[in-house]
Amino acid sequence: MDIFKHHESQVQSYANHFPVLFGTAKGSWLYSQQGDAYLDFLSGAGALNYGHNNAVLKQALLEYIERDGLTHGLDMHSEAKAHFIQALQTHILEPRGLNYKLQFTGPTGTNAVEAALKLARKVTGRHNVVTFTNGFHGCSLGALAATGNQHHRQGAGLALSGVYRVPYDGYAGVDGLTLFETMLQDNSSGLDKPAAVLLETVQGEGGLNVASDAWLQRVQAICRAQQILLIVDDIQAGCGRTGTFFSFEPSGIEPDMVTLSKSLSGYGLPMALVLFKPEWDQWKPGEHNGTFRGNNHAFVTATRALEAYWANQDFQTHIAARSEQVTQALLQCLSRYPTLFSGLKGRGLMQGLACHNGDIARDIAALCFQKGLIIETAGAEDEVLKVFCPLTITEADLAHGLTIIERVLLE
C-alpha cells in the first residue's frame, strides 16, 4: 500500500474510504489480495450496472480481441461501432419512439456534458445555461460550472460562469419553476435567456433527490415555450439504474439532448455519448473531437449488453423486484431508527436513507465496510447512505448486503 501513499496524488478519494488492495472481482463481489470478500453496493459509482466481469460481456470482448478487432480508430467507421449503433436503434430508441443523432465524445461523462453544452450554445447563439441546486455534472470547467457542490467547485482555480442556478424540485420548499418562468418573462430580472436547461431526473451525487413527473413535464413545457433546449444528464441515473433504460421515460418527456456514460459500455470501459434531435446536428466536421471518442472495445460490450438485457422486459422486471426489496428494507430501517434517519431517498436501484447529519452516514458506511460491504454516501453534507448495487445482483446477495446494514444499526 505504500506505493500509493508515496507516489499517487492525495486527490484520490474512494481509496481513502476503502483502504484495501483489491485483486479480483466477479458479479456483485470484489476480493482483496488477501482473499477477503466485499459485497459491492457502489458499482463503480454507476459504471458497473451489469456487475464485475459479466460473463456474457466478457466473452464478447475476448472473442473480439482474439480476432484482432480494431481497438482505436478515432471516429472512423468500424464494425464494432456499426453494431452498437444498430443495437441502440433496435433495442432502445425505436421501441421508445425516439429519434436521436449520436455523438461519441469519449471517454467520460463530463466529456458528454461539455459537448452538449457547447452544441446548445452554438445552435442557439446564447451563452447562459440554467442548472439546479445540488446538481452534479462533472469536474471539467464547463461541467463544473453547472455543478452545485462547493467541494468540487473550489477545485476549479478560477471563476465559474455562464450558469444560473434554480431550485430543484422540492428544494427548501421553494417553487423554483414559477421563479424561473417569472424571471424569463421579466426583462429586469437579470436572467439572460439560456441556451439550455441541464438537469438530472434523480440527483445521484446531490443526495438522491427525485424530480416528480409533473415537475419534469413542466420544465419541458417552459423550455418549449421559450425555445430553450432541454438536456437530461442521464450519466448516473440512466442505463437501467432507475428501472427503465432512460430515467426520464416514466415522465413522458422527450429531451432535446441526453448525455450517457458510466454503464453505457456495460463492462466498466470508458465510453460517453450525446444523443440529440436531428435538427440540432449543426456541427461542422471536426468542430468538436477527442482522441478517445471511438472505444471499439466499449462498443463491443455495449452492444452485447443491449442485446442480452434490453431485448425484452425481463431485465426491467428483475430491476423492479430488486428495487422493491431495497425499498422495503430501507423503510424498516427508517421506522426502527428515527433518531438516525429522516427519510427515504431515490428510486429504482439508486435509493438511500437520509441521515440527520453527515457524521451518522459516514460512520454507518465505515462500519459496513468493516463487515464486508462497500457503500458510499451522497448529498451536500454526505448525509445520505446510498445503496447502489449492480442491477444484476441476486435476491440473496442483495439481502445479505441489506442485512449487513441492519447489523451495523443494531450495534
Swiss-Prot record:
CDD domains: OAT_like (cd00610). The modification N6-(pyridoxal phosphate)lysine is found at residue 262. The keyword Transferase applies. Pathway: Amine and polyamine biosynthesis; ectoine biosynthesis; L-ectoine from L-aspartate 4-semialdehyde: step 1/3. Pfam families: Aminotran_3 (PF00202). It is an enzyme of class 2 (transferase). Keywords: Aminotransferase, Pyridoxal phosphate, Transferase. Its cofactor is pyridoxal 5'-phosphate. Its EC number is 2.6.1.76. PANTHER family: DIAMINOBUTYRATE--2-OXOGLUTARATE AMINOTRANSFERASE (PTHR43552), DIAMINOBUTYRATE--2-OXOGLUTARATE TRANSAMINASE (PTHR43552:SF2). Belongs to the class-III pyridoxal-phosphate-dependent aminotransferase family. NCBIfam families: dat (TIGR00709), ectoine_ectB (TIGR02407), PRK09264.1 (NF006733). This is Diaminobutyrate--2-oxoglutarate transaminase. It comes from Vibrio cholerae serotype O1 (strain ATCC 39315 / El Tor Inaba N16961). The gene is ectB.
